[in-house]
Amino acid sequence: MKSFLAYMGGKSLLASKIIPKIPAHECYVEVFAGAAWILFKKDESMSHVEIINDINLDLVTLYRVVKNHLEEFIRYFKWILMARDEFERFKCETPESLTDIQRAVRFYYLLKLGYAARIKGPSFSIATTSKPRLNLLRIEEELSAVHLRLARVYIDNRHYRDVLAKYDKPDTFFYIDPPYYGCEDYYGDGVFYRSDYEMLRNILSNIQGKFIMSINDVPEI
């Protein structure tokens, strides 16, 4: 199945090449989940336990709400307009002041109607050459399968070093898809620093489990 999110750095096109390379394992962990394309594309029977993690609390809240409160989430969209004014209203809201469901609705709306699914500084965009990215009449249909797929998935919100430490065991497989070198700030300020590449390398050099990392091929890496 497909991910329900358009998200910067998503692996929609590379998933078919990555998944066959995943070794046998018991526990599957996506450390930088983003749109979680590998999770959604792979056969869930490959793993006895599945965990997705992301440092972005808005994103994690969206996953948790779609998993646990889909009906309430969908209900909100009955009163929402697809318009620039509505986009700007959502954009100006403080996520911390909202309920989890409101926060998830806000983030999903901004992702769907924002230019290039930007996390940092989203701007309103309408495609003139394709169908609307957010069809209010089909949200329930589109998200029902996602709701079922997430039913057995643990959803975490930790720093990558804490995730690697918590779940590292010989039978764990980590899929690691950090921000690409040179794009560290695309996902927000203070989320990932250039020094994190070296820290990540040092941690991965000493784990018990196995991993695949997606990263751009540049001399610095």
Residue ranges and their predicted role:
Residues 1-14, 21-22, 67-189, 199-202, ...:
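SAM-dependent nucleic-acid methyltransferase catalytic core
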Residues 191-195:
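Alpha-helix N-cap and loop-to-helix initiation/capping positions
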Residues 209-214:
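Conserved beta-strand signature within the Rossmann-like core of class I S-adenosyl-L-methionine
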